[in-house]
Swiss-Prot record:
Name of this protein: Glutamine--tRNA ligase
Sequence positions that bind L-glutamine: D68, Y213
Binding site for ATP: E36, P37, N38, H42, I43, G44, H45, A46, K47, S48, T232, R262, L263
Subcellular location: Cytoplasm
One GO process term, biological-process aspect: glutamyl-tRNA aminoacylation
Keyword annotations of the record: Aminoacyl-tRNA synthetase, ATP-binding, Cytoplasm, Ligase, Nucleotide-binding, Protein biosynthesis
Catalysis: reaction(s): tRNA(Gln) + L-glutamine + ATP = L-glutaminyl-tRNA(Gln) + AMP + diphosphate
Gene name as annotated: glnS
Motif ('HIGH' region): 35-45
Gene3D superfamilies reported in the protein's UniProt record: Glutamyl-trna Synthetase, Domain 2, Glutamyl-tRNA Synthetase, Domain 3, HUPs, Ribosomal Protein L25, Chain P
Amino acid sequence: MSKPTVEKAANFLRPIVQADLDSGKHAKIVTRFPPEPNGYLHIGHAKSICLNFGLAEEFGGQCNLRFDDTNPAKEDQEYIDAIKADVEWLGFKWAGEERYASDYFDQLHAWAVELIKAGKAFVCDLNAEEMRTYRGSLTEPGKNSPFRDRSVEENLDLFARMKAGEFPDGARSLRAKIDMASPNINLRDPILYRIRHAHHHQTGDKWCIYPSYDFTHGQSDAIEGITHSICTLEFEDHRPLYEWFLENLPVPAQPRQYEFARLNLNYTITSKRKLKQLVDEGHVQGWDDPRMSTLSGYRRRGYTPASIRAFCDMIGVNRAGGVVDIGMLEFAIREDLDANAARAMCVLKPLKVVITNYPEGKVENLELPRHPKQDMGVRVLPFSREIYIDASDFEETPPDGFKRLIPGGEVRLRGSYVIRADEAIKDAAGNIVELRCSYDENTLGKNPEGRKVKGVIHWVPAAESVECEVRLYDRLFRSANPEKSEEGGSFLDNINPDSLVVLTGCRAEPSLAQAAPEERFQFEREGYFVADLKDSQPGKPVFNRTVTLRDSWGQ
């Protein structure tokens, strides 16, 4: 199988890792991919997965899969299973078993107690609204909580009672004692623990207090010996807090945080909240709808792991933002499928053709290559008196430049004979329901003498073809920036009404009858398609269009 032919773009982290290894700062690189299990992974996560696993692979290190499971109210085992499946589908394997931040809850609690004993943390009774008021703004410093000067003994007692479940949700929190006047709002006495009486998918009902992301993340990195903690740029302002915890706790290692620009893809939404809205309101048919930006959606659409990895190589890793053209992703899958997808013929809008001068009862088994370059063998197409062509390939009154079948005109059937249109049969409403044609028996594999036939069209045998459903997927949003809408509008206003067209009664060549789920094809002259992962069955295939043969949006 060929790989997509793309060059790796620059990755500013590669020389940093190389220098750390060369200097002996680290004997081995250890990275991690730390998703929160509160939704399905999307194309933006693919960039982080390829980056973290790719660096570890390139430099002979390891990458951990760690679930940042500190908010049980929004998390679910369903998401954990889906995330693991997506990472494996992309072609990566994490070191050892998957890890959970909840594995470290006991240690994190012990460290929180140490901060209290050192006078660096306190129990605060402010509610969320009061805390926002006290925190200040980007232009105004915050104010100290009235509970900031509680004694160590009182804080230890209250924190123990928080852990014992004596207080309701939100009644108290544990906060670090740093600097309410800091220009970095993240350092204004951030929350370490919240009260949440919620069942946890890993720890059950053991805990009713849960650590914040900021308190959990760096310490989990340290416990696992992470050398390069790589996250997106929105966490750059969190780095001083990340480092404050590491400096003020007896952690076993000192990881370093690096930030890169997240993936912004035009015509695409990756907000978990908005993706969930699309699902919940029925705008799409689930998280794995082939129009979704989720990895499970791309997989069902027919994208290959190799194409997504190639795309991530193409866009590179840097600290500068910007919007990536979705055409680059479509280029990557076209390159992959052009090189690796078997060819086949499928007629989306069948028009019956009767070849009047072809002997009745005669059948020729024509062999066509499964791929023009790779040695994939051949497929057999029975050719007889009755076939189907696509209705769009015949025009009674053709526009200028039309090179397909017209009254009295000739075309070549792909891999077969030249035929001439002699008569169009119509129903009472004037619709063409059948063509009567004649064939030139001397044109199998060669041009007719004395005349030039320009057009080549695809076809399938009438008797042996298999009926199928074809789903023509297109971009879910018609706007390059779907987040932008008219005043008072919503991103939903940008949904493309033609993002899915379902065609039934299509006719596919016989070899497609037993297409396996996720088997990919180039339907000649139509595009790249995949047998649907869920709905396609032997004898009743369902095909999803992955991408058109060419970029029709850029024209």
